[in-house]
């Protein structure tokens, strides 16, 4: 029953009610338009691209030859498109497409250590870069696996606060390219992670898991190019520590990438032997931006055994790095970073054929970088 008082109120606020009805109708129309044009109700599309313009200047022995082969200015790109699908709200099916044309210094041509994290070359073809599925088991366990999964996709914690999307490739391996080799292939892993920040993970993958010939590929075969990793980490909100162990086979391709070590260390890791790698990492991030940077550091050691290299039976290599990043430098969203370290170098070696060990222990140099990232818009940065 509409009382006189209610009629009076309706008449008094008639204009406001009409405005509200119009706004509701407008919102319903917009929601309908979004539902009609949205990509998917279960899938998110994420994309990123790097455009790189630059050149390198060479110094030292062999610089004239390097300049003649890779001394020009280049302009190239890296493109990534990721489709993330969830069927239950807790699981995730990741399909990532990638394309690039960095057949230049940024892809590791000439001096491998100058290779960048984004330095991929697919000759402009679009390839399936990732294809894996993860789902929870209970409240604390997660299983991850797929035909194109990378080692770090199966880790609950990445042991570094230093950015990995704009830097030299070496500085994206937490100082231990042997333990965190970022091997890619067919595999699976499981991890346990508590709300308090403690986690344990283990995984196995085959770099040639798509092949059925056990001599050149397969899973669990001599030709599998396998990589098995176990990590223990404790990572509360603003800091963390981690220890990792990886056993890998250099057979058919699993080993250090050229941007992660000296020529000798990379060659030995790719020989038909076994590697046992260890990594220790720690990182800390300040609660507020300011003069104090985030600090990340890591150290790695790799034992190489049963090598089929012509003059080497076994060897030991080491590596380390320290990375600092300041947030909101000059303007909110901008950042400045600097990193220094030693890419993987040989520290001990067992040679044969009358060779001199000292000839193989040379060349353990240093790598360093600094960057300033300017946030032009929410989605565009210039570094």
State the predicted function of each range.
Residues 42, 48, 54, 68-209, ...:
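Outer membrane beta-barrel
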Residues 139-140, 160-285, 292-304:
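Signature for the C-terminal beta-barrel architecture of outer-membrane proteins
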Residues 1-66:
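N-terminal periplasmic/intermembrane-space "pro-region" immediately following the signal or transit peptide
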Residues 73-77, 125-129, 182-186, 224-228, ...:
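Residues that define the transmembrane beta-barrel architecture of outer-membrane proteins
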Residues 245-272, 281-283, 294-383:
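Outer membrane beta-barrel transmembrane domains
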Residues 59, 105-109, 155-159, 163, ...:
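Outer-membrane beta-barrel and related beta-rich outer-membrane complex signature
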Residues 61-69, 116-119, 173-176, 214-218, ...:
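Extracellular loop and loop/strand-boundary signature of outer-membrane beta-barrel proteins
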Residues 33-34, 67-70, 81-83, 131, ...:
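Generic recognition of flexible, low-complexity loop/linker segments
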């Amino acid at each position: 029953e509409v009382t006189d008082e209610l009629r009076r109120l309706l008449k008094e606020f008639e204009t406001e009610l009409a405005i509200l009805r119009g706004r509701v109708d407008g919102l319903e129309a917009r929601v309908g338009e979004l539902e009609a044009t949205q990509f998917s109700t279960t899938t998110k599309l994420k994309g990123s691209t790097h455009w790189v313009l630059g050149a390198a200047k060479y110094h030292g022995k062999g610089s004239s030859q390097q300049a003649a082969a890779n001394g020009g200015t280049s302009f190239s790109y890296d493109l990534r498109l990721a489709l993330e699908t969830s069927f239950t709200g807790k699981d995730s099916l990741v399909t990532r497409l990638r394309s690039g044309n960095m057949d230049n210094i940024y892809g590791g041509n000439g001096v491998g250590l100058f290779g960048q994290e984004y330095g991929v070359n697919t000759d402009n073809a679009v390839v399936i870069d990732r294809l894996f599925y993860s789902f929870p088991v209970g409240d604390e366990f997660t299983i991850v696996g797929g035909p194109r999964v990378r080692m770090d996709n199966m880790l609950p914690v990445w042991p570094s606060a230093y950015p990995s999307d704009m830097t030299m490739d070496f500085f994206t391996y937490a100082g231990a390219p042997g333990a965190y080799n970022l091997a890619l292939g067919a595999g699976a892993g499981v991890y346990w992670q508590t709300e308090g920040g403690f986690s344990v993970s283990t995984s196995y993958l085959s770099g040639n898991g798509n092949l059925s010939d056990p001599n050149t590929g397969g899973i669990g075969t001599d030709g599998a190019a396998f990589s098995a990793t176990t990590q223990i980490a404790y990572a509360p909100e603003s800091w963390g520590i981690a220890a990792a162990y990886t056993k890998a086979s250099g057979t058919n391709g699993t080993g250090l990438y050229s941007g992660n070590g000296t020529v000798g260390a990379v060659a030995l890791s790719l020989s038909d032997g076994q590697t046992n790698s260890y990594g220790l990492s720690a990182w800390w991030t300040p609660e507020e931006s300011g003069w104090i940077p985030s600090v990340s550091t890591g150290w790695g050691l790799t034992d190489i055994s049963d090598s089929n290299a012509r003059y080497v039976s076994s060897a030991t290599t080491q590596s380390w790095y320290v990375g600092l990043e300041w947030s909101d430098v000059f303007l909110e969203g901008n950042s400045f970073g600097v990193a220094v370290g030693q890419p993987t170098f040989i520290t001990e070696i067992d040679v044969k054929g009358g060779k001199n060990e000292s000839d193989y222990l040379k060349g353990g140099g240093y790598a360093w970088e600094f960057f300033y990232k300017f946030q032009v818009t929410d989605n565009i940065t210039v570094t």
